[in-house]
């Protein structure tokens, strides 16, 4: 509740019905102001909720004096004559006065009429909600009048005079002629104005009726309240069956004075009364939602605002009218520290708690509920809901529909068409289709190139695309390639001329790569010059000439076979042709030498020589960087013809860069495509994508911006996808964390995945998201959305699911309980805990939800939920020896019923000790919870779970009796909200509980429980005095609810020889730093008979093993004779024990099953996190938790104790802890403990502590 405004008046009030909330107040009859003023006023107040500078306390906007005080006041609806409505006052002097609200605000004379038909005070009045001009008034002696505010002289009376006053009146909200009244005599009368007679009377058991409220939706439902302090009840009546109320709402401590049933939501009701409280209810279910901040005096009137039910006003006799909101979800402010330090005062140890004013409705009010709604869902889903028509009073329901939705159906169909063709591998069809539909020449050229690259002979197709097909050589004229040959007349010399072969006669157009390296034609030429034996010619020649000429030096080198020297001589003399002829005889190295020398002399002129120089020298970079861009196509053909495959992509990229820098984007795109440079061509395509979107927006079409963008992006993705497929692209940057060359492409993939997912094609979206790098910024969110939308919902694990049933006793499934064993108690479902995670332990019952995970474990491994994870406590063995540290017992005949335990009570001794650092500020705090002072239930059996049964254990003379419940404090008009711990006997001081009587202390508090007399059945000298506290860690844990004062003595423990006192579940401590309760022993002491009976059910009871025989009986008088016990069947002989399997050493984790490794990892990580952040004071507790978790891991490593289904439950708990869902983790832990006790070894306490510590650790 947020307190918005306060009106400093003790007055009756009414809300205006206009849009701006106004309040009218009239001085309340029967109240005295703080200054004892007798002035009576009618005042108007404006809330000014929108004014930020408006203070909490208001000032009236209009005020007039009246002759009498008000019992009640009402504000009618506006009308044509009265635009602000009419204010009616029920006056103490018996008059009915009417004022015009508009004139009151204007400061004019506002009195409309004053009528005195009533002979006594008018106690109540109300306007008819269906006929605003009709007003009903009720008062003393049973007087009931109905008025017409337009003509008050026509008022008529209903009924006759009666002995009792009518204190309340209410019009039916559905039938305008039905009126109900409630009298101080306890009768509720329903009137019918058509007949002007009472049609029905409800008997309220003679209890005065103080308030009536009609159901806003059901005309036959009626609420009544009584102001009787003994029976402060709200009754819900159904007039169809008026013999008894249909429901009873009980929650007030004293009489109820006012009711207000919300007109907009029949599930909301507000009541207030003499207990100073204002409660919020659901009258249809009887549930109490919460409570407004408590006043310091009676709250006599409360009302919803009729136009804005979020606002509620409540008037009280403490002189305030409070305007506040219906609910507040913020945490309440912690109460101030207590200053009372009187140790003798009972309430000093139980400080009064200021009740928190925060609660949330369990359901949304109807005015917040939408009758119809729609929402887009991820994956192309459209979710719509609408409210079903339900009869009045029936639970409301809604219908939800999930349908598919597509922003642009063309986008979805285009995506499906492309994906189908791509899966078939029909790349050519995709290219042809897109080329035909291309909007620009650039786009068409891209698809044509992609188709050419997709062919098996891609380079050949590129050459054809550029217009350089190989077949063009056939069209070359023979004259261009013929070489003129000299004609010589053959002479008859006997030398036969060579016969040319038909193939050799054809002129070959060799590739340029074999221009100099292929010497086949030269070989053929020389071979044609074969010598003929005996051939003689008439052309003699000299090998050597006269002198040292060039020819002579060359000839000498030739005849010596030194062709290299001959070549050098020719090159020196610039005889290049002769050098080539000689180089053919000397080998390829000489040929290359001559080529190099020749090309160096020509210096690239003509151009074909520079080109051939680049080809021969395998240096095509000269062509790429220096060739004129006007011949880029010829350059590309040269690269396709001569470039090595390893250099070809880089050469194409370099050529494309030159072209792109010159401004020809389309030609550059071609080069990038041919060179398989995806990162280069993508940047160009992104620019083309943006241009296509701009062009689409400028066109006069009905397409939306989204549709244009989606279609353009679809074409872009199709080109990229086909290109990746053609070049078999492998992305080597998926593992990088930044600096991606394809960053622009990844952005488009993300956009495209979002679009196709919005059209329901989640598998397609997932495929493109898989192409993104792992660390790409937008990839993680997109992947998670698709993964969550495509994954199947796993069935909810039973160990974490919320149980809808109430507490279920499991005793029936365990069979009869053998004598000496405690019947297992039912375990209630786990609720939220409000304990301090750093507080020391205090006792609760085993099923309580607020125990200490660090308290010593006794005979059970059970640790309730919500425990304090860092409370210092000594470590105790999980199964201590029975009776080892308790008082001795007197044993009687086995099986004999025990006498009732003696009663002995005493105040707990005061112990002053240094609390150390236990009260450090916790990491997590919770708002305090309002509690009442608990009382101790009487003991009807020695064991908490066997109420009404006699104890099977004998009671020894040294056993201490159960505590006597303390008397309640005197009841006042407004009892304080306080909590305390019931006094119980202190624990034994030594091993056997003996202690000198001089240590006993008495409590002089008037509210402390008196000491009880010695129980019957014990000799007077044997009554043991109360024992003092002890610091031994092996004493029994104390019993009782947690103390509310952190410095008050903690409740003491009972000795082991006595069964635990059945106390109610202890509520969580109100103080966030108060000691948290510790677990009480849920198991009974060991049986005290000679032999144990065999189990009577298929499932053995859980508890300590029976003793083989009783110890010797202790001294003391034996108890009286009892009935003989039933005969017991001896147990069957034990089977021979099998040798234990070999165990792996502790700490070994190499044999943990694979299905448990995830759980072990999560628990270990969270344990390390807690250990690193826990305060140093709680290091022993953290270490003990680590040790207990290690025991669990050892069990898993050895394949023992924990079954596979339990491992699944533990994995779910570990996942819940990792996800900080501690409520689910606690529920899962309780499920395992309840259903699989036999598997819960010492590790269960460690698991429970880890949940609590993890919850408390930020």
From Swiss-Prot:
Protein name per UniProt: Protein transport protein SEC31
Subcellular location, record wording: Cytoplasmic vesicle, COPII-coated vesicle membrane; Endoplasmic reticulum membrane
Subunit comment: The COPII coat is composed of at least 5 proteins: the SEC23/24 complex, the SEC13/31 complex, and the protein SAR1. SEC13 and SEC31 make a 2:2 tetramer that forms the edge element of the COPII outer coat. The tetramer self-assembles in multiple copies to form the complete polyhedral cage. Interacts (via WD 8) with SEC13.
Topological relation to the membrane, as annotated: Peripheral membrane protein
SMART domains in the cross-refs: WD40
Keyword Endoplasmic reticulum: yes
Region (Disordered): 470-511, 792-1153
Single biological process term from Gene Ontology: endoplasmic reticulum organization
Disulfide pattern: none
GO molecular function, one term: structural molecule activity
Annotated keywords: Cytoplasmic vesicle, Endoplasmic reticulum, ER-Golgi transport, Membrane, Protein transport, Repeat, Transport, WD repeat
Feature: compositional bias, Pro residues: 896-909, 963-973, 1035-1044, 1061-1075, 1083-1120
Main localisation: membrane
Repeat region (WD), residues: 6-46, 65-109, 117-157, 161-201, 204-247, 251-291, 294-334, 375-403
Family membership noted in the UniProt record: Belongs to the WD repeat SEC31 family.
Biased composition (Low complexity): 792-805, 845-874, 1135-1144
Domain of life: Eukaryota
One Pfam family hit: SRA1
A GO term from the CC aspect: endoplasmic reticulum exit site
Function as written in the Swiss-Prot or TrEMBL entry: Component of the coat protein complex II (COPII) which promotes the formation of transport vesicles from the endoplasmic reticulum (ER). The coat has two main functions, the physical deformation of the endoplasmic reticulum membrane into vesicles and the selection of cargo molecules.
